[in-house]
Every structure is written in structure tokens, then in C-alpha cells.
Amino acid sequence: MVTRWLQGFAFAVAVAIASPALAQPIAPHSFTVKNGHFELDDKPFQIISGELHYPRIPRAYWRERFRMARAMGLNAVTTYVFWNMHEPRPGAYDFSGNNDVAEFIREAQQEGLYVVLRPGPYVCAEWEFGGYPAWLLKDHSLVLRSNDPKFIEPAARWFKRLGQELAPLQVGNGGPIILVQVENEYGSFGNDHAYMEKTRGMLVEAGFTKSQLYTADGAEQVPAGALPDLPVGINFGGTDAGAARREFEELKKIRPNGPFFNSEYWDGWFDHWGGPHASTNAVNEADNLDWMLKQGYSVSLYMFHGGTSFGWMNGANSNGKNYEPDVTSYDYDSPLDESGRPTAKYSLFREVIAKDTGATPPAVPAVAPTMKIPEFKAEQAVALWKVLPAAVHSQQLQSMEDLGQAYGYILYRTRLNAASKGHLVLDGLHDYARVYLDGKLVGTLDRRIDQKQLSLDVPAAGAQLDILVENTGRINFNIILRQERKGIVGQVTLDGKAISGWDIYPLPMDQPEEYSFARSSCEGACFYRATFHVETLADTFLDTSAFSKGQVWLNGQPLGRVWNIGPQKTLYVPGPWLHKGENEVIVFDLQGGTGRTLVGRDKPILGGKAE
């Protein structure tokens, strides 16, 4: 009986992979759980999915990535929905351009793929603040990931608006969305089942009733994070031999009857600033994938394609005490690299999927070549001090969120009322500071390595103290995210005495291209402008090794962060973001100087030598 079921199951999977028409329904279909497995239109269905995130991929490349997914043998793709991208200010929604998640899902369907949707509202994902909009932190009494009405009200409003975009695309309405995840790994955070029920209720009220709801946790966290009447996915990695068997054995102690779904199969890992570039054991990962597929279990690769956390969107990790900001690249050592090119891992997984499903996948699409750009100089500059906005005066320090700011930098300025010599202490530095006295740099402090104080010699009353603070990325994991405000969130003391009376300058750096640049030397924190010409539009990798720490924009598009501690030394430049003819690069660098150069490489440098 079991053998006959598996034979029929394998046939259904093979047909689903081989026939795009099955993933392009023109009429309503059903997707449910029956007899311990997923069923599509009352037939067993094995999900073989891969995760990729629409804001981490240039819109012009979405369809190419989907075709690569089909060619590897996948029958579905998985994506989070990133609340902070869609509601940057309360009630102001953005589903345009790269935020058009509905179009992303429609294109997936057109390319023969089902969709597993993960709307959060919390998503983790090594993404800024786990996908939460920073404005939630303005109310210091609001409790994230809880039944606090101050949190539930904006979350429910957000889900209702998202439902207008995506509920029509559920499989029961003729769309490709087969699964919708309730929250995300909540069992690693808490065990408030009333909150999980409320989150499920918000999704139902938003119209997510024509697909199958589920929860996802680590196997041991399922009791804390799951809902008893919903199927569960479990999240784990395959670097260790036999990992999949062990994880599902653990799950079966709690949920012996299935369905069995590895909702995040970690096939790589992410990088922190100051650490190594991650790489994982592809052979063991392929073996664990092979074992799961042979059992008839469903799986979603995390990640199939990582892409890039463009601009300010990298997250950070913490164990509750430390701080580990993520780099801009989300290459993840995944089957498709950061720029969408298949790796050795892609070929290995493709072979496993074809063998286990008995289906011949489509041919792997040809990949356009990358290009080099000759070295060019950043010859124009303007000092940050010359483009400061109007100040907000406050007796006490205020955070970015207190001032309605989400990302970027913030400057705290004051006049010291007496000569003194002692320790300057920044209590609650989030995250990186450069300290100036009368315009001269006296030191840097880095939350990443738990730096909080430096020696300060104030020669006379009236000296100007400037503290320039960078938001290096909000923590996206751990309960500490509830207090993850940026700037200085405590007090500044000198020789044990609190300093008050501040001029505060919010520096979101939304449009640095509007500054007035000139050919001149620049000291301290500076914006640099450079231009280069191309006649061919192709991907390249901008080598920023000549700069120290800051941010880069290309033709007005935010590319990401620069930090000379590595491991990342290049920033991915998508070909569609280039112009034929002149292109503009702006670099904000905390360390001024002259002779700064840039170069476009045909391969990335994500850790050590070019990949």
C-alpha cells in the first residue's frame, strides 16, 4: 500500500515539475492537507521549492530567476513579504517598482511555479529589523510580536492592505499561492499561543482563506510556536551528514502524522562584517536533500538565490548581548550566486532532484556575461558638515525613531561648559560613532566590539563636541529587537556627569545626488562623486577598497554599505541600473581624503580573492 502511494506520489511530482500548465491554473484549484500529506486537487503533491526575495533582486531579473528555478527542477518558489518596504510611513503604502510583490507572484505563475508566501509580519531573513518598519519603535510602550493592541492595530491594517494585493492570487482563486505562513519561527521567540491565534485571525480577515495556512519553527520549538490544527514546517540546515533524518525524527515525536515539510532547508549561510565569507558542505546538503525527496517529504531551499540587501536593508544578529551586523551581499553560498549565476551547488541539486522525481527539467538558461569597468576617480567632493539639515534642539538625547527617521546617520552636537579631562561614555550606542572635538576626530566607538568610551581632553569651556552615529542595521532576531532604536539610546557622560543640551541632526541621506559637489579636497566625513561611461549594459561588481566606511549610490539607486574590515570588498551593480553613456557614483565615506578610485570587476570579492 505504501509502495503504491509513493509510486503515485512520485508520478504527481514528476508531472508537476515537467508541466508548466499545472502551475498556471486558469480556474480555482484546491490545496489542502489529507492523510498526512499535501494534496493539490485531491492528488498528493510534493513541494520542491526555493526561496528568493523580490526586493533583493532587480525587477528586470525576476523572470530570469524563475526560469533558473524551473531549470533546477523546482515546482515552487518561496518569498517573505517585507512590511518595512511597503509601509515606510504609517498608512503610506508602496507596491511600485521593485516592491510590486503581486507582479513578482504573477510572473512566478507565468513561469510555471507555485508560490509559498511568508507574510510575517515578522520575517527575520537577515533583513533590517526583521522586516518591521522602524516607525513602530517611536512609541516606547509598544510591544512587538505580542497581543499589545498598539502592535496589533498597525499589523492588522497592514495585512488587510496586503490582502488586497495578494489574496486574489491564492490557488483557490486561480493563482499560484498554495501555502501562507503564520508569523515566523515564533517558537524561538516566545510561546504565546494567543498571539499566534491572533496572527492567524488577522490573515484570515485579510482574505487568506483560499490557500493552506501553516507555521514554521525549529523541530524542538514546534510546541511553542505551532497551532494545533495547522500543519508545521521545520527549519534546519544540511551541512551535517544525516541532519534531515535526525530533524524529522525529532518532529515525529510531536507530530507523528505529517505532513512532513522542511520549510527552510539552509543550504548556505550569511556573512557578518569583520567575519569570514561563509561556505557550506554542498555534498552533505545534496545527500540530505536526496534523503528528504526519497521519503516524499516537501522542501524549500533557503536560499535558492540570496541576492543583495540593497541600501540600508541588511539586518544584524545578537544573542542578547553582542551585535553582529550583516554585510550587504546576501550571496548565502546558495545555488544561484548573488548575481543570479548557477554555482556547482546548483548543478549538484539539479541532479538530485531529477533523479528523485524522474522528471527531466528544462535546459539551464544561458547567462549574460559580466563586465569590467576601467578604474575611475572620485574627483568631486562635499563635506558632510556643509550639507547639514536644520537641527532639532533637545535637552536630552533622542533616537532616530523619536525624530521619525528610519535609516542612515544622526549627528549629536553640543557645547561643553567647562575644561575637563576624563572618559567620555556613550551609554546605549547604536551602532558606530565617530567623535569630534572642535572639528577634529578624537576617536571611534563600535558596538560590534562593545566599545563605549574614550578619553577626552577638553581644553576650555565652549568646545564643540560632535558625535556622528551610524545605524549599521537593526537586529532581526532575538527579543532584543523590541528595543532596537538607533542613535544613542542612553546618556552621554563626561567624567561621570551627564551632558545635556543637544542640537540633533537627522541624516537619512535620501538624495545625496542633490548636493553641490566641487573639485576639492575633503576632510572628515565626506560625500564623493565620480562618473564613468559605458556603452554596454551588463552586471559588474564595484570595487570600493579605496574607501573606509560608508554608503554607495549608483544613478540614485542605493547599492549598499562599504566597510574596509571586510569580508565584502565589492558591491553588486545590476546591468539594468546602468545607463548607456554617463553614470554617476556617490560614496559617503566617514574618512576624508583625496585620490579615491573605483573600478568595476567581472567577479565579486566577498571574502579574500575574487570569487
Where is each model-derived feature located?
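The substrate-binding groove and active-site-proximal loops of carbohydrate-active enzymes
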Residues: 47-58, 83-100, 137-156, 181-192, ...
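Catalytic-core region of carbohydrate-active enzymes that cleave or remodel glycosidic bonds
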Residues: 206, 210, 239-337, 341, ...
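Aromatic- and acidic-residue-enriched segments that line the glycan-binding/catalytic groove
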Residues: 91-99, 110, 120-146, 160, ...
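N-terminal carbohydrate-binding accessory modules
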Residues: 23-76, 106
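An active-site-proximal structural segment forming one wall of the substrate-binding cleft
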Residues: 100-117, 140-177
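Active-site neighborhood of glycoside hydrolase catalytic domains
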Residues: 151-229
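Aromatic-lined substrate-binding rim segments of carbohydrate-active enzymes
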Residues: 62-128, 200-205
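Aromatic-lined ligand-binding clefts that engage carbohydrates, nucleic acids, or primary amines
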Residues: 422-436, 465, 532-555, 562-563, ...
